[in-house]
Design a protein with these regions (language model features):
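Internal acidic/polar
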Residues: 4-5, 86, 94-119
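Sigma70-family region 2
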Residues: 16-17, 40-43, 54-71, 90-92
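DNA-recognition helix of helix-turn-helix
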Residues: 81, 85, 125, 133, ...
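Arg/Lys-rich amphipathic alpha helix in sigma70-family domain 2
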Residues: 61-68, 78-99, 115, 178
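Structural recognition of an alpha-helix C-terminal capping motif at a helix-to-coil junction
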Residues: 50-57, 70-82
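C-terminal edge and immediately downstream basic/flexible tail or linker adjoining helix-turn-helix-like DNA-binding
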Residues: 2-3, 14, 43, 110, ...
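Amphipathic, Lys/Arg- and hydrophobic-enriched alpha-helical face
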Residues: 26-45, 62, 126, 177-178
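Short, charged helix-capping/linker segments at alpha-helix termini
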Residues: 2-3, 16-25, 35-54, 158, ...
Length: 184
């Protein structure tokens, strides 16, 4: 367990006991990454901001159920994913939101992809991956979650998370190489 994990677990335990300062520190540490993740899932800053607020509201409501043996960061990212999925189901039901994977917001690029194309090209290529591949790829390579943590967030096995990320990276490499050849 990393020092950051231990600190977040201690903060969460204090938050469960009613510490507002502990919540503020958890929010300060996790909100930027959770927002980037939600921006990937739900393009459009206004929607991502709303989902971020809903995620931390859900964390507040669920704080008593939090198990201190589980890492806080993947737990909160899992809450964010669930909030996104509930929002998407509601949007489909009411036809209120039209999503476009082409309008992904800015986000840091994958380290090895940086030399293969511009951020816009990489974004377009990621947008054409299957949603499962793109999500696993970004959770692992961009946000640094282990395959076990991804498995817990997505409700799949660690092997399935690894396979999705691996296939996504392979498809991304092919797409970026095709773009490079087309430019040459």
């Amino acid at each position: 367990m990393s020092e950051g994990d231990q600190e977040l677990r201690a903060l969460m335990t204090r938050y469960q006991g009613g510490s507002l300062e502990a919540f503020q520190e958890i929010y300060a540490q996790l909100a930027p990454g959770v927002r980037r993740y939600l921006s990937h899932l739900a393009p459009g800053s206004e929607v991502a901001d709303d989902l971020l607020q809903e995620t931390f509201l859900q964390m507040h409501r669920s704080r008593a159920a939090y198990n201190p043996t589980y890492a806080v960061r993947p737990w909160v990212f899992g809450l964010a994913r669930n909030v996104f999925l509930m929002n998407r189901r509601a949007a489909r039901r009411w036809a209120a939101v039209h999503e476009s994977r082409e309008d992904l917001p800015e986000f840091p690029v994958l380290p090895e992809a940086d030399r293969l194309g511009s951020q816009d090209e990489i974004r377009r290529c990621i947008a054409h991956l299957s949603p499962d591949q793109a999500e696993a790829l970004l959770l692992h390579h961009e946000w640094g979650f282990s395959f076990e943590e991804i498995a817990g967030m997505l409700g799949i096995t660690a092997a399935a998370a690894r396979a999705r990320a691996s296939r996504g990276m392979a498809d991304l490499r092919v797409a970026l190489n095709n773009l490079q050849r087309a430019r040459a």
